[in-house]
Amino acid sequence: MAGTEIVMARLLDLFCGAGGAGMGYHRAGVDEIVGVDINPQPRYPFEFVQADALEYVAEHGGGFDAIHASPPCQAFSQAVKKRYRKGRPNLIPETRMALDRLDVPYVIENVPTAGVHMREPVTLCGSAFGLPIRRHRLFESNVWIWGILCSHKEYPRRYMPAWNRTNLLRVLSLSGGYQQGKTDIEEHRAAMGVDWDMDIKELSQSIPPAYTEYIGKGLIALLEGE
């Protein structure tokens, strides 16, 4: 509408990976998205900064209208064998502390087994968005967001859980990590709702953009109502 102020023009996407979360916010209507990751992300579809996410948000976070963070989940992921999880960083508390210092809405995303470290998270599932995957993920926020009930019966999973895999080098999981069973990468991208060139590893570490599109629309509606 002409003359309407844009209330969520800029979003900071921390630990951005290849952009699954960022793309969802873009589809929700966020004008500008800046992704930050310690590793190069050549297929990230928006402005990208290679940097330490927590150092970047401490210096620049106040210049954004909202912040999304997906701290590394290897300390909790069932795709990583238990004996290898020891010593993996749990950055959820440190990420929350950094975001709590800022007066902006934020969302923290992680895997279900990280739930004990998250504050009143809601769960999203691919089946709730008509996707043939489950990819359950938890979302914590300092503003109110709603979860959606799964629709496992209506949209059954076509892929086995990641922890049932036998060959980590040649196969892709749509539950997170690698899994037994090969399919065409275009099929995996379609199942995730990804329409840009993510590779196998990036897909395995991403979330479906539908999750943050849903959350982003809710954030925008909330901010417009203030």
Regions found by a protein language model. Name each.
Residues M1-V7:
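Short, Lys/Arg-enriched N-terminal segments with co-localized hydrophobic residues
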Residues E5, L12, E120-V122:
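Generic extreme N-terminus detector
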Residues A9-V57, H68:
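SAM cofactor-binding core of SAM-dependent methyltransferases
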Residues F48-A66, C73-E226:
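Class I S-adenosyl-L-methionine
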